[in-house]
Swiss-Prot record:
This is Nucleoside diphosphate kinase. Keywords: ATP-binding, Cytoplasm, Kinase, Magnesium, Metal-binding, Nucleotide metabolism, Nucleotide-binding, Phosphoprotein, Transferase. The active site is at H115. The lineage of its organism: Bacteria, Pseudomonadati, Campylobacterota, Epsilonproteobacteria, Campylobacterales. It is found in: Cytoplasm.
Amino acid sequence: MEKTLSIIKPDAVKKGVIGKILDRFESNGLRIAAMKKVQLSKEQAENFYAVHKERPFFKDLVEFMISGPVVVSILEGEGAVLKNRDLMGATNPKEAKAGTIRADFAESIDANAVHGSDSLENAKIEIEFFFKPNEIC
């Protein structure tokens, strides 16, 4: 069974839409195999988004991700990576299809409500970043 990582970002946590977002996952066949609410440190955010270190938005992304708590979860199901990405919608909420998480809950391309792994390989890396094996069930 495929697994993917999801992060409900600070903007969506602050808006109080955690339950609505989790319901989208579950009602579309994704099981929550693990979940926790965390306040990322600057170092954690920098390490998690290290792939973007040379990009002009890196500093703002890190600052945003540490601006409040996030909800990190492992979603499990058939085609979990692609299913989650379809549910999230385009990175820019203005381009996201109606009914997607970002179209419904995101504020901007920066405060875009959710993160999801973009491949099985990255899902494995991202899951290991946040979860110990005994936390996944």
